[in-house]
């Protein structure tokens, strides 16, 4: 009976499920693990980075992307779907919202827009759900925040969470280690340790990517934009953190 609904994009099965969304979640769970942790003075996003070949240039594989100078996001799942959502998010933040209000959107507003785009693909003919889950970190007048958005368009705010293949083990680790007084530096160490719990092999600056959203504006910002709160850590900075754990 389930097979009858497996390829329908918009039809509920008798037990109330959209099977294509479950398949999209399977794509997320097949992806590498990504971790997000909210600290008292910022948010850290960390993810595994596995080149498909030893000949690939690792530095060209970016999994953490800036949406505005103060908001960044990472994914687990299908990379091409993520790129589409990054483009749509940037269009909303930097074109639509900024033209009207002359400022970038607060983190929650942007998350709601992303979630709406993802939800629409679950009820429209001729499309399929996005095969990604997102962790969105941002800084606005309310302080640092961390959200998770799933293929169904569901979103929640989190103190700390993980998505991807080893998310269950990573969440269990975070539940043991997290506390409300955690500062950003400690959060980076905790994120690395959470990935290390389930990583096959040795973590190096070449196979992990880390970005932070800090309460303090960065000197260089992103892509030359000064004063932003989002910053992707360099390989040398990641190496220093790895040496400390």
Swiss-Prot record:
Q: Does the keyword Thylakoid apply?
A: no
Give a Pfam family name: Proteasome
Signal peptide boundaries: none
SUPFAM superfamilies the record matches: N-terminal nucleophile aminohydrolases (Ntn hydrolases)
Q: Which UniProt keywords apply?
A: Cytoplasm, Nucleus, Proteasome
Which compartments does it reside in?
Cytoplasm; Nucleus
Q: Does the keyword Lyase apply?
A: no
Q: Name one GO biological process term.
A: proteasome-mediated ubiquitin-dependent protein catabolic process
GO CC entries: cytosol; nucleus; proteasome core complex, alpha-subunit complex
Q: What is the annotated quaternary arrangement, including any partners?
A: The 26S proteasome consists of a 20S proteasome core and two 19S regulatory subunits. The 20S proteasome core is composed of 28 subunits that are arranged in four stacked rings, resulting in a barrel-shaped structure. The two end rings are each formed by seven alpha subunits, and the two central rings are each formed by seven beta subunits. The catalytic chamber with the active sites is on the inside of the barrel.
Record's function text: The proteasome is a multicatalytic proteinase complex which is characterized by its ability to cleave peptides with Arg, Phe, Tyr, Leu, and Glu adjacent to the leaving group at neutral or slightly basic pH. The proteasome has an ATP-dependent proteolytic activity.
Q: Which NCBIfam families match?
A: PRK03996.1
Protein family (similarity comment): Belongs to the peptidase T1A family.
Protein name (database record): Probable proteasome subunit alpha type-2
Biological source species: Schizosaccharomyces pombe (strain 972 / ATCC 24843)
